[in-house]
């Protein structure tokens, strides 16, 4: 979710808006509309923006856009106008307009993280709507430098940028306004990276950065980005679970599968998603052996409590599926898990 800008405390309506913070959205909307009719607040810009917030809270998205259009002549010079227009256009699905709105905000307040995150998210949505959400779009060197984790854009020679510009990968003016897939991916990567590396409290930027790095098949960098989520963050557990999935989601190797298993073993087994992810890792191990046409891994070390062999991994997968079935909330789900366990368990006489 995108944040709402802080209220301008110098605005004549600031005190009134602070008084509505604990009201229901419908009550807030009615009070603000009444206030706008009084001479005391007719010069306020925050009260009209408060109306937009209340409308969005009520799900009145199209009404909010109509209201913003009515404010254009009076308040379009205010960056908050473009922010709320961007949020509204995002909810409506007009991503190109939202991109332009958030770019205007970034020009007005270039040091803020919020417009950078907003543009990166919009670029992802445009890529998704055009079918480019997954799949590498950038040169390896460019995606790694844009991520800013181990290398940086400043370390690349100018000739590299000139070559990318000639290919249309980069815009000559580095504009944020684009519908070109490579430019969208590059901008989103570097904006997520810029926010994450300068403000570690914005954990959403870490997940965004890792998501795009996975699309670029930069698994190790995606894991490195999420490993930087601090232990004190309430999102730390989710970040660690995501790294496990990342390690077994792309090109499978024995090393990555073992690393994923070790990471999962460090997480308490009362974690609600523990068994689900254990199933995912065991399945990845079986897939690795099957695709390689072998019955056992190169190393004799076990994976979890099972030998890294086809037979023992199938036994482990069946056991884990049955454990998951015991805690399944619905009978239909439980039966499906037991059926899956029966299909994968190794054949026995009993």
Predicted regions and their residues:
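Regulatory extensions appended to serine/threonine kinase catalytic cores
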Residues: 1-48
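Alpha-helical repeat scaffolds
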Residues: 28-35, 63-71, 96-105, 131-157, ...
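Short coil turns that delineate tetratricopeptide repeat
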Residues: 42, 76, 110, 200, ...
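Non-membrane alpha-helical segments in proteins
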Residues: 46-57, 80-91
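Alpha-solenoid helical repeat scaffolds
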Residues: 49-50, 80-84, 100, 114-119, ...
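Residue-level recognition of tetratricopeptide repeat
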Residues: 53, 87, 121-123, 128, ...
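Structural motif corresponding to the intra-repeat A-B loop/turn of tetratricopeptide repeats
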Residues: 58, 92, 126-128, 182, ...
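C-terminal non-catalytic interaction modules
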Residues: 280-350
């Amino acid at each position: 979710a995108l944040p709402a800008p802080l209220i301008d405390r110098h605005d004549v309506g600031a005190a009134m808006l602070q008084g509505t913070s604990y009201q229901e959205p419908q009550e807030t909307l009615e009070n603000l509309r009444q206030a706008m009719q009084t001479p005391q607040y007719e010069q306020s810009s925050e009260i009209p923006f408060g109306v937009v917030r209340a409308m969005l809270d009520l799900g009145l998205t199209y009404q909010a856009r109509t209201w913003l259009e009515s404010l254009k002549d009076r308040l379009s010079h205010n960056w908050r106008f473009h922010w709320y227009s961007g949020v509204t256009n995002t909810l409506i699905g007009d991503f190109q307009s939202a991109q332009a709105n958030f770019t205007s905000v970034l020009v007005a307040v270039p040091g803020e993280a919020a417009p950078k995150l907003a543009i990166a998210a919009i670029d992802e949505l445009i890529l998704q709507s055009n079918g480019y959400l997954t799949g590498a779009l950038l040169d390896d060197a460019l995606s790694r430098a844009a991520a800013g984790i181990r290398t940086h854009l400043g370390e690349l020679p100018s000739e590299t940028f000139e070559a990318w510009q000639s290919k249309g990968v980069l815009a000559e003016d580095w504009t944020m306004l684009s519908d070109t897939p490579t430019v969208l991916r590059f901008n989103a990567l570097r904006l997520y990276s810029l926010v994450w590396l300068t403000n570690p409290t914005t954990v959403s930027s870490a997940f965004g950065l890792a998501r795009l790095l996975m699309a670029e098949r930069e698994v190790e960098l995606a894991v490195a980005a999420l490993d930087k989520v601090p232990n004190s963050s309430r999102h730390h557990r989710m970040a660690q679970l995501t790294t496990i999935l990342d390690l077994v989601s792309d090109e499978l190797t024995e090393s990555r599968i073992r690393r994923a298993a070790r990471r999962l073993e460090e997480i308490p087994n009362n974690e609600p998603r523990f068994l689900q992810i254990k199933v995912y890792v065991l399945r990845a191990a079986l897939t690795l052996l099957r695709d390689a046409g072998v019955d056992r891994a190169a190393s004799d070390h076990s994976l979890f409590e099972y030998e890294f062999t086809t037979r023992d991994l199938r036994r482990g997968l069946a056991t884990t599926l049955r454990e998951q079935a015991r805690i399944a909330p619905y009978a239909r789900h439980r039966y499906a898990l037991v059926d899956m366990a029966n299909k994968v368990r190794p054949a026995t006489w009993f």
